[in-house]
């Protein structure tokens, strides 16, 4: 068994990073060799065997994410493989899980609860609407579809994924996009209808006579009432992550040092921009898992991004801000653009409008802004 470096790597380490090292050992000895190290993809695993880099592939976290990986590869069900994202949020950091969770997986909450959570056919099929095609909505949809319900997902955008799709934009997090692809494959398998570019309204939902409605409309960015917030050179983090706005060789100020703020700054920095991040907190990306956070901050430092903490933004000027630090007012100037990353709030307007229809449920960020592991967990529990 050949391992190398840190035993459990985050998404900042390339998939299959250890394969070439394993091959060097295999070429030098005459006993079977097992290789390991972020091998989470069927093509990667099969190619490692085919080119004789190893005799066996060890699937660690990938087996937690999808215990059926080998059989799915054998049966050609590649599009149904749940891919480990390297997030570490339920497999490694297991101190505060709901319902006594031990080791499990962010995108597969069934992992570790196989004997407790079982998808059984419903005694009576229902007509169910799900509003929102993010991870929570799609997870609930395919489970309900598998139970035999008639499920329709309404997604206002042309593609599914919501905020989760934007989270997959940074290069090292692109495996997140595979989660949405797999959930959609499950939806297709279990006859879930997904209607894109369709805004669900109270009138539409009432007309369709659904037995139950699940609101999974996600979150909206927090926009504080700061003077200058509407300036023409002020953008939201989502504008950057969706590539609606791209900066090159500019000086950019990011307001907010949560995970979204720092990752947005990282993306901007990778395009050759000079970036500064400001936040009133005393710690950057405080809610991020320990090792990915460490990797993120190391990369941000390598990019020359400056993070200014304990600094409260008071006003946005044409080329910077006025902020308060240690009781003193200070200024930052000379910036071409300012990006807002002040966090998220529930997008619950539709829920408030339709809750009187009866049998209406709300999950994920639409209930309380949080993260994907919370949203997917809530969706799974409700659908069961």
Give the positions of each predicted feature:
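Rossmann-like dinucleotide/flavin-binding elements
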Residues: 122-153, 195-209, 217-230, 238-290, ...
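Short loop/edge segments at beta-strand edges and connector loops
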Residues: 37, 180, 196-199, 217, ...
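Short beta-alpha connecting loops at secondary-structure transitions
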Residues: 5-11, 55, 165-172, 280-285, ...
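Residues at the C-terminal ends
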Residues: 27-28, 50, 146, 189, ...
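Rossmann-like dinucleotide-binding cores of NAD(P)H-dependent redox enzymes
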Residues: 150-190, 267-311
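Short, electropositive alpha-helical surface patch
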Residues: 15, 45-58, 206-216, 332-337
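Flavin-dependent oxidoreductase catalytic cores
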Residues: 1-131, 135, 139-146, 151, ...
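Well-formed, non-transmembrane alpha-helical positions, independent of function
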Residues: 24, 47-48, 72, 186, ...
């Amino acid at each position: 068994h050949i391992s190398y470096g840190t035993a459990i790597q985050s998404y900042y380490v390339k998939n299959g990073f250890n394969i070439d090292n394993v091959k060097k050992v295999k070429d030098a000895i005459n006993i079977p060799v097992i290789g390991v190290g972020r091998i989470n993809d069927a093509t990667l695993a099969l190619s490692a065997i085919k080119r004789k880099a190893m005799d066996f592939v060890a699937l660690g976290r990938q087996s937690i994410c999808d215990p059926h990986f080998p059989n799915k590869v054998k049966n050609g069900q590649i599009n149904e493989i749940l891919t480990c994202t390297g997030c570490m949020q339920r497999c490694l950091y297991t101190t505060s899980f709901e319902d006594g969770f031990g080791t499990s997986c962010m995108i597969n909450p069934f992992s570790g609860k196989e004997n407790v959570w079982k998808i059984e056919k419903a005694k009576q099929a229902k007509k169910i609407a799900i509003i929102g095609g993010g991870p929570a909505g799609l997870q609930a949809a395919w489970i309900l579809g598998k139970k035999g319900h008639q499920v329709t997902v309404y997604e206002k955008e042309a593609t599914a994924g919501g905020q989760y799709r934007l989270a997959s934009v940074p290069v090292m997090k692109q495996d997140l996009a595979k989660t949405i692809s797999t959930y959609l494959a499950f939806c297709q398998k279990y006859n879930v209808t997904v209607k894109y570019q369709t805004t669900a309204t109270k009138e539409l939902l009432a007309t369709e006579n659904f037995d139950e409605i699940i609101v999974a409309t996600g979150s909206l960015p927090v926009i504080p009432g700061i003077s200058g917030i509407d300036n023409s050179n002020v953008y939201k983090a989502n504008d950057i992550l969706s590539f609606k706005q791209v900066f090159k060789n500019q000086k950019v100020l990011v307001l907010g040092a949560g995970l979204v703020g720092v990752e947005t700054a990282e993306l901007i920095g990778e395009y050759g921009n000079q970036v500064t991040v400001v936040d009133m907190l005393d710690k950057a990306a405080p809610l991020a898992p320990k090792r990915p956070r460490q990797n993120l901050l190391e990369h941000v430092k390598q990019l020359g991004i400056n993070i200014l903490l304990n600094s409260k933004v008071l006003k946005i000027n044409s080329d910077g801000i006025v902020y308060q630090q240690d009781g003193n007012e200070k200024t930052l100037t000379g910036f071409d653009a300012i990006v807002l990353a002040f966090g998220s709030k529930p997008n619950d307007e539709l829920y408030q409008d339709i809750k009187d229809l009866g049998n209406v449920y709300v999950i994920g960020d639409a209930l309380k802004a949080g993260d994907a592991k919370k949203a997917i967990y809530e969706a799974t529990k409700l659908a069961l």
